[in-house]
């Protein structure tokens, strides 16, 4: 019997989730975890509404995993330490997560991979070191999947977009059928029996995280997977007018899905598939905006200096 740990990050949903699908398909028992990253939270204002948005999304993930027969372990601290320690404690054979492309996230993931290797090798010297598997999930094409004919990264959007569209096939828009293997989720009873005092299996409050309580009504966006779904369905009714209305705030012409895409409560594959399936200028313009996300992540990967500097400084 093999087991794995899925680390939720900027992918706060239980459907069409690459890492969760691959873990469930490959292992008999799959644990799930979310870490409230203290290295990030400690730098934020105590009234930062992003934390409330994330908290609501985590609550929904926990509820959905419970409905599917699983559970969500909640931790707070530095994931560079928390994830390897949890993997060693659970005795899993692998940790699964979806890839992040920001420089700080790349450094974090490299440290997590090294600490997993070091800790698990020390705790289980007779076994192969645990693996840390990362999957593409928040973009359609990543890193080096769309390049110039010379094999170099694009630096101008329109040629990148044209190459992106040329490469696109239905294969890249296929959803991951997580529920097909949901029986492999490790449930609450398993965790409470094995670790009755050590693991938090409930979502903390904002106050417990050190933040000011926020009335859900004060959040300007509906939250979580259900909120993202609602916004998407509402936007499909306005899609035909997107190209003309998006630049006018009073027209309510945008999708309002930016935060949901940022934290993964919606699936980029689902959105791109819908946009690609529709005709008209509105759908084409929205698809172009979704392609821009891939372009930006590709630029961030190849040119990490853009985090703090101009991409092409004026000479």
Please provide the spans of the model-predicted regions.
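Trp/Phe/Arg-rich N-terminal binding region typifying the photolyase-homology
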Residues: 1-172, 176, 282
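Glycine/tryptophan-enriched, flexible segments
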Residues: 152-314
